[in-house]
């Protein structure tokens, strides 16, 4: 089982991730990790932090001569901004008097509940760990599972379908055309846009909307669509709640900072229709075996992969740190005041898509390992080929 933990504060010396359970024998390059970190830093509407950081992962363990060796992989990403925070984020020194305590929580953020939960007299520790800066470590960690999956013919990609009210067409033929060549083809096309949109009109509308809210000191959220191609039928299980693949994928998406909703396939649209207009019918073909003409279920049925492309959707709220303040109060004086501003992005929806790709990768990798077993890439690949051949023969009978 692949599992990972991240550590580090937004303005501490570094972020770290320890990835345990990755099989041995997987070819991994430095670029496999750093290219994903670079993608995360892109996107129209990002804040000043992205001009400071240039994220690179230092591999401290678990890889030898370009291959995973089965032991925990430790990744370290240094924070260049740390040099400006050595006093505020000092680890052992006594706090100096000029460091002001933060006592005014921002609505929509972890500030208030985090301060109360952990008994702090300063909101700063909450801000540091709840920050989406942490996702850099998760993108690095997820890149390892992503490499593993791609070597087995499974690809992950995403694009942004809406930022604010600027939205892609509900039916976009370009998506299906790109997915024919794998989900990474879709992601590469999306990456050509500064807002990771496929439709030029929607892209222009999103950029204009970001510019407008930035002038107003406001922020924007949006919707990201995630696709996973090449997943064989039968991953996950209906037998127990904690083995349901749909639940694990949605949980992974909901773990991303500022994600407030997740959907599989056309779930909410399907809820308004009769079953005869929702369920994806089976058709048998002498040439290809089992066929389906629709994928409204998003590649998941009965909590298991159906063999179709997995389609997920996630909704990101507008970022909680606003230049134009909202009503708040001071925890020290218990008097009303306006909320404070912490350096942030105007819109981080494009980056959230990259993070979403990263967090679903270990989920799919674990479902595959649960089905196939194995400790070395070669034996896992052999078992997957055998299983795929079995599926092919089953539906060609």
Curated annotation (Swiss-Prot):
It catalyses: 5-O-(1-carboxyvinyl)-3-phosphoshikimate = chorismate + phosphate. GO terms for molecular function: chorismate synthase activity; FMN binding. It comes from Chlorobium limicola (strain DSM 245 / NBRC 103803 / 6330). Pathway: Metabolic intermediate biosynthesis; chorismate biosynthesis; chorismate from D-erythrose 4-phosphate and phosphoenolpyruvate: step 7/7. Disulfide bonds: none annotated. It is an enzyme of class 4 (lyase). Keywords: Amino-acid biosynthesis, Aromatic amino acid biosynthesis, FAD, Flavoprotein, FMN, Lyase, NADP. This is Chorismate synthase. The gene is aroC. This reaction introduces a second double bond into the aromatic ring system. The keyword Disulfide bond does not apply.
